[in-house]
Amino acid sequence: MKVVIVGGVAGGASAAARIRRLDEHAQIIMIERSGYVSYANCGLPYYVGGVIKEQAELTLQTSESFWDRFRIDVRVRQEVTAINPAEKTVTVHALDSGKVYTETYDKLLLAPGAKPTVPALSGVSSERVFTLRTVEDTLRIRRFVEEKKPKTAVLAGGGFIGLEMAENLAEMGVSATIVQRPKQLLAPLDADMASFVHAEIRRHGVTLRLGETVTGFRQDGDSVLTLLEGSEPLHSDMVLLAIGVTPDTHLAKEAGLRLGIRGSIAVNERMETSVPGIYAVGDAVEVTHFVTGQKALISLAGPANKQGRIAADNICGGNSRFHGSQGSSVLKLFGLTAASTGINEKAAQAAGIAYDKVVLFPASHAAYYPGAQSMAMKVLYEKESLRLLGVQIVGGEGVDKRIDVLATVIRAKMTALSLTELDLSYAPPYSSAKDPVNMAGFMIEDLESGKVRQFHWNDVEDLPCNGSATLLDVRTEWEYQRGHLDGFRNIPLDDLREHLDELDRGKPVYVNCQTGLRSYLACRLLTQYGFTCSHLSGGYSFYQVVTKEQQTARSAYPCGMEKL
């Protein structure tokens, strides 16, 4: 059997190695357009920033190491320019020599990945405007930074690459500005959870220009102007386009393969395309979202590697299946970790799923052990079935551990109530006896059993302030004096029993505390004394971060932009 693989990196390289493990006698040819067949593309921003010191550390395998270990014929700096499914051939252009030749195949695997989205704007070809996707891109940016020593940079786009580059540039002393049309960074997060990310970025000196549209670029001596719709241009020494990626599927389209959403390659669970004998994996293919069942584009290394393995199994006569991706991701940003899995509120609404949510602020480990850090945790679940839909966590240490546990719960199709039963490891330096994952389950259990009601940060402005309801803040007097919600009366939780006669049982009670715990306790107390009570999910802390970010964003917009 002769297998030709178009593209390396995650999907193609993992498939090549798997095919060899399954079939020692197969002829395997891997053709890669760049000069690097297998590299850590997720580490590229950290090489630019000097966190990863040596270029060699980015290289996972080379052409030589693939041959020595797997006897795989790797051809770098060669580009497949056409596929002929009827003849089972590909046309290859050797970029260095200019030679064009034809290669036959029995099985063909496409792993072309995705290319940076470069809008058709004036000035994008400037030598000071960069994209970051390959090792060559990284070397070009690193060389520019070392030689030109830029003081300012504009990043067009606020996805993973844009944020990681903003962090690395800021750590190098470069004044960075992120500009994008959406008013929120990190699309997998809901806007309220993204507020924590925005605040952290601003705290480290990165300027956010959200809700603004880039209309072009113009070279201005040793700087470049980023032109904005309705605003003054931004002057900087360099620009990085981090708008996103687009599936690189022109070969598949020209070969007559069926395409999916946004021009991606349509595949089945076996990673087979619409043409027999041709498989496809990685960022170029559409997948089924594990939670919604809808088609999606999820450009992540984990799914690409799994798809490569599955395609290899089936190329070698197996029957492996890819059952979809839930988009689990994690990001380091200065002192913060942001992670998500499954779907957010916007996606749940788009899919027509009736859901509820809880917000909590647990500590990373036992609070009495030094170094505990808080995290903001948002858990979505389906109302009818109680299945877990998605989780977002932003905080310090321990975020990655919890998101992986909850990603496993989603994959296992367990209910939100099952979180209460998870038997998780505990020692004071690592967790609490009631782990944050368990705590989320306890909160959902109380909600669903009717033991507590809740309202959310965006409900606060609609609360009745005409005396028809009791608005109660159960924090300490000191906390209350430092800041509180308008119209809320302060009765500390520990004093509440002594003040029950001052409250009208005929009025609904809305309770607030710092993070939601004491308000929950107050509601349980009040309910048992005949009051109808709801508490603020996430408490004053959550409300304050979200509303403060909204105010900061509004003040940053040019006049009228806040309405766009």
Short names for language-model regions:
Residues 59, 152-153, 160-218, 298-304, ...:
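Rossmann-like dinucleotide-binding cores of NAD(P)H-dependent redox enzymes
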Residues 1, 284-397, 428-432, 436-462, ...:
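Mid-to-C-terminal Rossmann-like scaffold of FAD/NAD(P)H-dependent oxidoreductases
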Residues 25-27, 69, 75-96, 103, ...:
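A Rossmann-like FAD-binding core segment of flavoenzymes
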Residues 110-172, 207, 267-269, 489-493, ...:
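Glycine-rich dinucleotide-binding loop and its adjacent helix/turn
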Residues 6, 103-113, 156, 234-244, ...:
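Short hydrophobic core segments
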Residues 417-428, 432-469, 477-510, 514-564:
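Rhodanese-like catalytic fold shared by cysteine-dependent sulfurtransferases
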Residues 125-149, 221, 233-310, 405, ...:
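FAD-site-proximal beta/loop scaffold in flavoenzymes
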Residues 1-77, 166-189, 328, 401, ...:
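Beta1-alpha1 glycine-rich phosphate/pyrophosphate-binding loop at the start
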